[in-house]
Regions:
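Basic, polyanion-binding surface patches
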Residues: 2-174
């Protein structure tokens, strides 16, 4: 019979070292969110982001990370407001297209024909076909490597459990 040490060593020997892109494949699928923020002209910007996590139950907190040069991150830091949404599968093509351009130069809502709706108590709109919306206020932003982590208190959760959310498969390298 093998000892615990021998079994542990065998398991370790079966593992190989990965880079972060390979590691993301092993944690897929991840909810693919659309970060909704207010643009300078008052319209809504949409940015697909998978670097999102619940951070606290009391108070309810959520965090998301954007690249340091991200227009979306800049707008959230300037306005202090954001709505983190989980879009539905019907928006898969539009969500991918939203990730291909910056909201600083493109009206992503119009360019991708995304039907939007108002959220009570917010001047930021969200896609009509949304499974979950977290209306939030920025509490803190922290530089983390090549990204900025936005730590937000959730003011209100809105959800439709009958809708099917969109997920990112096979990590972030595809």
């Amino acid at each position: 019979m093998q000892s615990t040490t021998e079994i542990s060593q065998k398991g370790l020997n079966d593992m190989k070292e990965l880079n972060i892109m390979e590691a993301t494949v092993l944690t897929s699928p991840n909810p693919l969110t659309l970060i909704c923020s207010k643009k300078e002209d008052g319209s809504t910007n949409l940015a697909p982001i998978c670097f999102v996590s619940y951070l606290s139950f009391n108070p309810p907190m959520v965090g998301f990370a954007t690249g340091k040069q991200s227009h979306t991150g800049k707008r959230v830091r300037e306005t202090g407001k954001v709505i983190v949404t989980v879009p539905c599968e019907s928006l898969a093509g539009a969500v991918m297209a939203c990730g291909a351009s910056t909201g600083a130069e493109t009206d992503k809502v119009a360019a991708n024909n995304i039907e939007m709706m108002a959220v009570e108590g917010s001047d930021i709109q969200i896609p009509v076909d949304t499974r979950l919306a977290m209306v939030a206020t920025l509490q803190q932003s922290v530089e983390v490597g090549d990204h900025i982590l936005h730590i937000c208190q959730v003011d209100k959760f809105l959800g439709d459990e009958d809708k099917k959310g969109l997920y990112a498969w096979n990590g972030f390298g595809k």
